[in-house]
Amino acid sequence: MNYNHNQIEKKWQDYWDENKTFKTNDNLGQKKFYALDMFPYPSGAGLHVGHPEGYTATDIISRYKRMQGYNVLHPMGWDAFGLPAEQYALDTGNDPREFTKKNIQTFKRQIKELGFSYDWDREVNTTDPEYYKWTQWIFIQLYNKGLAYVDEVAVNWCPALGTVLSNEEVIDGVSERGGHPVYRKPMKQWVLKITEYADQLLADLDDLDWPESLKDMQRNWIGRSEGAKVSFDVDNSEGKVEVFTTRPDTIYGASFLVLSPEHALVDSITTDEYKDQVKAYQTEASKKSDLERTDLAKDKSGVFTGAYAINPLSGEKVQIWIADYVLSTYGTGAIMAVPAHDDRDYEFAKKFDLPIIEVIEGGNVEEAAYTGEGKHINSGELDGLENEAAITKAIQLLEKKGAGEKKVNYKLRDWLFSRQRYWGEPIPVIHWEDGTMTTVPEEELPLLLPETDEIKPSGTGESPLANIDSFVNVVDEKTGMKGRRETNTMPQWAGSCWYYLRYIDPKNENMLADPEKLKHWLPVDLYIGGVEHAVLHLLYARFWHKVLYDLGIVPTKEPFQKLFNQGMILGEGNEKMSKSKGNVINPDDIVQSHGADTLRLYEMFMGPLDAAIAWSEKGLDGSRRFLDRVWRLMVNEDGTLSSKIVTTNNKSLDKVYNQTVKKVTEDFETLGFNTAISQLMVFINECYKVDEVYKPYIEGFVKMLAPIAPHIGEELWSKLGHEESITYQPWPTYDEALLVDDEVEIVVQVNGKLRAKIKIAKDTSKEEMQEIALSNDNVKASIEGKDIMKVIAVPQKLVNIVAK
């Protein structure tokens, strides 16, 4: 008889709900474990089979840690602000609140049906005013610390949509949605000074138990480089062009400068002869996103401004060009081009027939740029020096002339924080008519997002909130001064920057969270989620956490001690699952046909947790067959416990049981769930080979199965005669002495040829080994009629007989 998953799973989900089995109490002295999932955006599509992979992994660990006596925090919530809900509202005229609420209900039902052990009393929702009150409060702390400021930033402005788009929303100069033209336009935006924390964000990565590849992604994103700031005087002008270079030693080879089309000097230095060309080029560049402009594969373009600069060390005149591959937002928005020793500059110089001056020997600059090491040539006082020495000397020479200095540069830019959207947290700032601005008093938080039917863009570059006079216009009660509320909203990243803190104390109305509770639970011990959040979410959350640490609000420097990225589940043909391909698998269907336990087991058994693996119906069926085998081993047709399970131990399963406990325990610690499941299968196969199974061993097995397949785990535990839930039962232990065999297999050779393999007791003496070998029938046949010259016995290994 196979088990009825629909009945059993519903029964135990109801039991857990009614008994609040997974409710977490803040037992502040107890050893703790905080297991966190990246909370989902509740889209209209509901859960897909990719979601449960990470969720199952953290759930297994949470259940395992509870059984080890840990106080476990394992919460779930909703990252519910963001563009898709607003887009839906625009397209249908429905309120994004209703849409979001409905989606959350669907997600929650699906998640509960998968048997995850979340404490639902700690659920958070980023769109709940009681939650975003504290998101706004954190913004005010950032503002007071000088880390939030207004700046004029070049943004992707789409007049047809009446809004600013992110770089990801612009493709080939048009909007991803609707294909409308997009232009680069300077607009006032809120920016967060993440660059102030660049060095800390970089240095503290070393202490984290994160995948090295992910740490490298953050290191590259921060992009710290050491070099020099160099100043070039513009010929016949007061202007100076400042560049940052990591290779000041190559300055004698700088044969032209390239400015970004938006550089502040371009208009003033361009000569009349080149004005029209420069203007036309600037217009074209404004239609491209930064990603397109810096694409290495694209053909280089640029125009000469007619102006020249003076090389501060050689005194030579060099041309000043503009080109879109130089961005105004990186470094100084200008570069010194050394075509002999840089591939991109070489390509540009060849295309526009600009001078190529070799300053490091070792290559052939007629054919290609030389980017290797070597002695300096054609470089004045730097001649004969190798790279490092030349860099130091070049900086000294520049400093002496007042034309440069040593400098550290970062690729990381400050974080553009405002969005011209409705469905986000209002930024708690008021702009007064006298030109000042203040934050909303903390006691007035939350500043509520007003309800409105008019979500369409304002058309002015402000958010739809600008259309709501009752929200926008304010008067200071004390002075009578008029003001306008900030109409931009926060990005979706804001709510997800700190949600792991709110889970610790979700109902606290007086503070973000109780300091004692924060001290108990932080840092997060295990954080599992997709690698697509490697940079933005994880970097932003680390930044906010460090600010809160400096303010004395959180007790740790870092939020997430161990981080793990689960792999992607692909469609059957190894393709990414997508609606358009029609290969998306809905977990609801699997729960119905195979059961939640089967889905959980299968997703953990597919392969290593971090690998990308194709979905397979056969694999799913195989996982179900294993659970049926477990059920049949333990449960009779009539639902009673099998008589095969006995209270006496005939020792036949001693070794495999103890091996299983050891292997599963070790594999759970390293998230090696696929190999842990293989070992559980080995144990069940051995149980089928014997007549009797020792009850404590099968109980230990059920405890190990329960974190992976909790519904069948609970049901079998109750069949074994237990009334209480398996959730807090102690994790099984193993006996080292029983892991080893008392028997070994030895080989017997005659004149170097293998003649027999024999099992003997481990402590057999050399003399006994010789006797056993010589009495073996195969060996007897091999030495018949021969004289035995010598017998060599190596304990536990072999017996070698030399016969003539």
Curated annotation (Swiss-Prot):
Major enzyme class: ligase
Listed GO CC annotations: cytosol
Motif ('HIGH' region): 40-51
Pfam families linked: Anticodon_1, tRNA-synt_1, tRNA-synt_1_2, tRNA-synt_1g
Cellular localisation: Cytoplasm
Keyword Lyase found: no
Enzyme Commission number(s) of this protein: 6.1.1.4
GO MF entry, a single one: leucine-tRNA ligase activity
Motif 'KMSKS' region: positions: 576-580
InterPro entries xref list: aa-tRNA-synth_I_CS (IPR001412), aa-tRNA-synth_Ia (IPR002300), Leu-tRNA-ligase (IPR002302), Leu_tRNA-synth_edit (IPR025709), M/V/L/I-tRNA-synth_anticd-bd (IPR013155), Methionyl/Leucyl_tRNA_Synth (IPR015413), Rossmann-like_a/b/a_fold (IPR014729), tRNAsynth_Ia_anticodon-bd (IPR009080)
GO biological process, alphabetically ordered: leucyl-tRNA aminoacylation
Catalytic activity: tRNA(Leu) + L-leucine + ATP = L-leucyl-tRNA(Leu) + AMP + diphosphate
Keywords: Aminoacyl-tRNA synthetase, ATP-binding, Cytoplasm, Ligase, Nucleotide-binding, Protein biosynthesis
Domain of life: Bacteria
Residues engaged in binding ATP: K579
Family: Belongs to the class-I aminoacyl-tRNA synthetase family.
Name the record gives this protein: Leucine--tRNA ligase
